[in-house]
């Protein structure tokens, strides 16, 4: 079942670029779409995944090992995971994924 969410993070485009560099170019299994844009307080993301399990595997095995050291370096601590607002997806129409 498609899993999508949005959340805000208090980082700038420079920190985001460091995170993306650390993740490397390989597309995460199950990722349908990822959007990030600037807000007044940092960045906002929208992610769409094939399933919640795909997202959780990526977060635990790939994202957190990259993000946590960067946040520790920049902030002196690792803040709690931001609150995710889960989206009630009706359709995900992309060039790679029929809903």
Residue ranges and their predicted role:
Residues 1-68, 72-99:
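Short S/T/G/P-rich N-terminal loop/turn motif that feeds into the first structured element of a domain
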């Amino acid at each position: 079942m498609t899993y999508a969410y949005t959340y805000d993070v208090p980082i700038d485009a420079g920190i985001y670029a460091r995170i993306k560099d650390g993740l490397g170019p390989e597309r995460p299994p199950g990722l349908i779409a990822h959007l990030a844009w600037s807000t007044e307080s940092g960045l906002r993301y929208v992610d769409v995944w094939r399933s919640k399990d795909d997202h959780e595997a990526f977060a635990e095995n790939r994202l957190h090992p990259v993000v946590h050291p960067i946040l520790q370096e920049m902030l002196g601590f690792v803040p709690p995971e931001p609150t995710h607002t889960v989206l009630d997806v009706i359709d995900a129409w992309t060039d790679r994924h029929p809903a």
